[in-house]
């Protein structure tokens, strides 16, 4: 015991304070678009994307790229293969959005439905809730029930967000065992057929008002399982979703950002957050 106490006192407080620290060099971020134009006829990025998250719009001399972050698994192949610097890496933890459309990066916002059509292989629950219901209710505490529908990686990151380094509970989040005690439903995985009915029953057992948070690319669009016979291709094919946290899996800081967005304490990710600069760098507001 004396050795343990000496170790703990010598290390001090392990919990990292907000704002989140600068991501390490070896941490892979999300794709981002720059002002650099694509080469004529080039579709290298779309060809290597394992989840069809990249759509080539138009063609000819000036093709345009659209990136669906809700389908992106952050493999890094697109910005590694891009010969013109049109796609670069954006090292940011703040990726949680309150709208599926906000996860689509494209210059012409009118093209967003066209891009999402690739991910929406099955009808979605519409209309979904446009905003988080009366978020002031949740600003001090949020009790969440986690339902895993086939993704242990995202479950592990949710667990990591509760460790002494990240300590998500200091912001008021508490994981509960019963949906009757929950304000929020955290969903991970592509929602397999066997889990659709239990998921709906869990949602039905929750009292109003309630929030649904899709954690991870699988829960948003199906991820690498998209189009599989046993996958619903995302949680919003079964339930209305309020907050989307992309990533495969998302970093604990990204999960914390999503939690704070759900509680009304932080602003969600928006496409206009990204300031286009040049082909070699990208600046992000509010890092």
Across the structure, where does each feature detected by a protein language model lie?
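Flanking helices and flexible, charged tails adjoining ferredoxin-like Fe-S electron-transfer domains
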Residues: 1-19, 79-172, 178, 276-278, ...
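C-terminal functional extensions of proteins
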Residues: 227, 231-287
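Generic secondary-structure signature for well-ordered alpha-helical cores
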Residues: 50, 152, 204, 208, ...
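Local cysteine-cluster metal-coordination motifs and their immediate loop/turn environment
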Residues: 37-52, 70-84, 145-160, 217-224, ...
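Ferredoxin-type iron-sulfur electron-transfer modules and their immediate structural context
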Residues: 1-48, 52-55
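Fold-independent oxyanion-binding glycine-rich loops
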Residues: 35-36, 69, 90-92, 108, ...
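Iron-sulfur cluster-binding cysteine motifs and their immediate structural context
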Residues: 33, 42-73, 77-104
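Cofactor-cradling patches in redox/metallo enzymes
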Residues: 155-165, 170-254
